[in-house]
């Protein structure tokens, strides 16, 4: 009888430990795969790279630094629409970039142009702030250091530029040469049966020096206009938000979007 009692005690003890571990595991999984900015990072550069990887800069190291310095909203922050409503599908966002939305037209391609323009404006490179509209007409910024004029210019750009103009304006870049600031972009006109195009910006790149493998942090805006946010990697929740890049792939699945390899562009 004593042996049975001892066995039962051990059995139920193990069962309790397993149940507790399972509960904690589920809670941890939910916290890290559903909570926005679960570790309360301050900037994109605070998001750690997986073991064995090292961050790499692009041709313009200052641009890489700028993107990594983008501020993030705190733990639990939601992606909000320009209208003030909460966006649907919050689980697609890993962290919200702390930048105000400038207009109801600031959508996916506009978000990419916004980040590029913000970098050039911050560096005082005003003459380089220019984007093409859908008719290939170049819209040049002429407002100098005035923040008011800068935002006014961007709102005008948003009204006449989109994924179509952005995909034509930027230069195609091979996947093997990907760098921070690059853009995955396709226009609706490039996809049979597609009503909308989409654009996603590469905001960070890391490389494993031993294997040569690269991983990416991605950010996007979307329709309707909403906060720019770092995307969650739904396919690898334990590595979220880093996406593994297959440089030999013809097609890439980035969250819920699919891109062709030849749809990577650089400035």
What would you call each of these model-derived segments?
Residues 97-177:
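Extracellular-facing segments of soluble proteins and assemblies that are Gly/Ser/Thr-biased and enriched
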Residues 148-214:
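...with weaker cross-activation on analogous glycine-rich loops/strands in unrelated enzymes
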Residues 2-19:
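N-terminal Sec-pathway targeting helices
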Residues 94:
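Residue microenvironments linked to proteolytic maturation
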Residues 29-89, 102:
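N-terminal module-boundary/linker segments of secreted carbohydrate-active enzymes
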Residues 215-217, 221-267:
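Low-complexity, Gly/Ser/Thr/Pro-rich intrinsically disordered linker/tail segments
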Residues 18-28:
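Hydrophobic alpha-helical membrane-insertion segments, chiefly the h-region
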Residues 72-75, 84-89, 168-172, 192, ...:
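Mature, folded catalytic cores of secreted/periplasmic enzymes
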């Amino acid at each position: 009888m004593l042996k049975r009692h001892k066995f039962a005690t051990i059995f139920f003890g193990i069962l309790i430990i397993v149940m507790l571990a399972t509960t904690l595991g589920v809670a941890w999984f939910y916290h890290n795969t559903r909570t926005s900015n679960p570790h309360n990072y301050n900037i994109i550069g605070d998001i750690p790279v997986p073991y064995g990887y090292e961050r790499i800069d692009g041709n313009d190291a200052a641009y890489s630094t700028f993107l990594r310095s983008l501020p993030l909203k705190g733990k639990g922050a939601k992606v909000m629409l320009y209208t003030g409503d909460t966006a649907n599908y919050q689980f697609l966002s890993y962290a919200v970039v702390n930048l105000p939305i400038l207009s109801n037209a600031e959508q996916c391609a506009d978000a990419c142009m916004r980040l590029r323009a913000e970098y050039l404006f911050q560096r005082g490179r005003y003459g380089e702030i220019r984007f093409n509209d859908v008719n290939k007409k170049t819209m040049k910024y002429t407002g100098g250091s005035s923040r008011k004029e800068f935002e006014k210019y961007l709102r005008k750009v948003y009204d006449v530029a989109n994924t179509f103009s952005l995909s034509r304006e930027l230069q195609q870049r091979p996947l093997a040469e990907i760098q921070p600031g690059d853009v995955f972009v396709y226009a609706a006109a490039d996809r049979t049966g597609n009503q909308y195009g989409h654009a996603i910006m590469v905001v960070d790149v890391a490389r494993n020096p031993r294997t040569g493998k690269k991983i990416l942090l991605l950010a996007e805006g979307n329709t309707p206009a909403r906060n720019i946010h770092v995307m969650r990697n739904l396919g690898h929740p334990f590595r979220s938000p880093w996406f593994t890049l297959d440089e030999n792939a013809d097609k890439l699945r980035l969250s819920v979007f699919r891109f062709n390899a030849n749809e990577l562009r650089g400035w």
